[in-house]
From Swiss-Prot:
Cellular component GO terms held in the UniProt record: extracellular region
Principal subcellular localisation of the protein: secreted
Entry's localization field: Secreted
Organism superkingdom: Eukaryota
Positions of the pro-segment in this chain: 1
Domain commentary: The cysteine framework is XII (C-C-C-C-CC-C-C).
Protein name as it appears in the record: Mu-conotoxin-like CalTx 12.2.1E
Function: Mu-conotoxins block voltage-gated sodium channels. This toxin reversibly blocks voltage-gated sodium channel in cephalopods, with no alteration in the voltage dependence of sodium conductance or on the kinetics of inactivation.
Annotated organism of origin: Californiconus californicus
Expression (tissue specificity): Expressed by the venom duct.
Chain coiled-coil ranges: none
GO MF, one annotated term: ion channel regulator activity
Length: 43
């Protein structure tokens, strides 16, 4: 599931990286456009 334990409070979920704390949720990552700093991890 989602991982929200990074020092920056970022969320990593199935290849998606939300660099903003509000993007991080207990169930995973916020996939909506309302999340600023939404990036795709091509790796």
């Amino acid at each position: 599931r989602g991982v929200c334990s990074t020092p920056e409070g970022s969320c990593v979920h199935n290849g998606c990286i939300c660099q903003n704390a509000p993007c991080c949720h207990e169930s995973g990552c916020n996939w909506a456009n309302v999340c600023p700093g939404f990036l795709w991890d091509k790796n």
